[in-house]
């Protein structure tokens, strides 16, 4: 694909401006409902906000049948949300993203619930329970949302309690023994207060057999709930409080190995993709809770004073058979927990002035703890040390090695006994303070100038112990002055950043705006609290890293045409990242790997997004979106295999093109007092690389002939559909649904694990089922 540029938008803008002249007048009296968002922390029409935004409302959530945040990414241009395990959820926007692999490394996309930051990767994949809409903001959002939104932000807006007694019950059943039961009740307490409670319980069997244990991996077992309270305390003071929780516990699949543990040869125990042979079932357990208190006070001068207090806690436990084999060679057990307190104050001006503005103060504190073990299994000596010693690939440090017992060899080369651990323990305490301003000045009837800035300061204090004494030939380091007697690393760092933003909007007519926007953002620096090679740790390489920054430029159009029956939004962008933080598994040779985080690169992303919704008739709507992307390392010396120059390579997880196309058709059935609904969606993402090397195949770590397919995920197209019958009084609905109807079976992800194993993550197969809904 040739590099997209702002000129692409120019032709599109010209065509759209001409569209009203060519459109025939329509007097049918039906239009697409106006979309309202709070992307700038005040209620505005979507077309008036000079930011590239996608909105997924409650109807779209219900009709597509998506249940988790990660499912939304398929429908939104230039957005990827990982579908692997929830412990390391990754959101990528415009080619830029990162999972918070350890507690010292933050993500690049902020995920919020009603404006409150949910936290790091284990908390990201929220259930879409009782939501009004999902807003996806593309591009840096540093002015209003602050740190770690260099790629964008996602805000889940919940449906607030209202003054009517009503509720909803639904039951969903499908193949793979899928079952979901949901309930919602909204209860008026008096004329000034109301409450709501929503609950969802989801279960689904796995679809990847583990032939050693007899279990099926990649199952779902999730309980989600949300309680909300709204009080009109006085005519001027409104109180909104909420509590939400999510508990999940299931057998997961990190990857289906296509090589042995060290990538010396192909996988022998279960070579068929989609079947594994592990000695135990990997597991992912999450307990995520959040509380919010929102106080809104309408002042006599027309201003609004707002206080938003949030507290969120996440406990995540993750285990994996890291040898990917039916015997107990080595395994991992990770436990991370996060406690987050945030407080925000906002002063918001009236909406009808020439100058509208908002002042804000923000405080954020996160206490993160980690407890991670690599455990040498009971079969480690017999099935790892022994075979390598017998083949001559392990040589004890003796002048003329005699034939030694395997356990002696293991001890001589530095491994601990079976059951011993290589571990890291620690905590990171983050304190962040910010003050911000955002305003819009109406220059004339057609021109508006937007401007804002945020000043942030953030400190991180780390107390961390890495003990690699039992790691043998893998040479994991140990913290402290004496690696033979590890002691904690105690350190701190502070980042400060000024993030300005400016925009200019021109109203072409009453229904069409074009805008240009500049915005800056930053991702905070931190500490790489991971398994670092001993030599690199001693040299202080890849341990502490600096903040990264971004400057972004965007040109867009948002308009309504054909008398309000066609909405079209376009955006083109270019963003330049400096000191880009790269998190890599680095192969050091000889079976040694190090996990590095460095400010190693300069990155440029360019592209465009287009979204359209057309109300063809009163009963028929078409929707489409397109994303074009070119995300490359402008400069990344030493970023490839064996220190090769990765400059000019594409970023991982950045497909050149993504699109979605769908239609919704209603058929009235007056005799039944009901209506048929038919919805079909097609989603597509191009192939993309998974490493900075941009490889498509790699050699074995031995003389084994041939290569291993690794480094690129194939393009993927899915077809989803729903056929429903719903009563005209909205009392009941019965629907049949199907997802991935063509049974697309190409792997959806891949990885190279710490010891060298290359593994693929099989796609979710075709799923289908029936949903029953009762509203009261």
Which ranges hold each PLM region?
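Outer-membrane beta-barrel translocator/receptor signature
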Residues: 106-108, 120, 127-138, 143-210, ...
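Membrane-embedded beta-barrel scaffold of Gram-negative outer-membrane proteins
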Residues: 290-300, 304-322, 507, 513-519, ...
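Gram-negative outer-membrane beta-barrel transporters
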Residues: 357-358, 445-449, 571-576, 598-693, ...
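Acidic, small-polar-rich N-terminal luminal/periplasmic segments of exported/outer-membrane proteins
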Residues: 28-164, 555
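Outer membrane beta-barrel strand-and-loop segments of large Gram-negative receptors
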Residues: 23, 332, 336-347, 393, ...
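Outer-membrane beta-barrel domain signature, strongest for Gram-negative TonB-dependent receptors
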Residues: 192, 214, 219-358, 364-370, ...
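C-terminal beta-signal and adjacent terminal beta-strands/loops
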Residues: 576, 683-700, 725-776
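Solvent-exposed loop segments that connect transmembrane elements
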Residues: 208-216, 253-277, 321-331, 373-423, ...
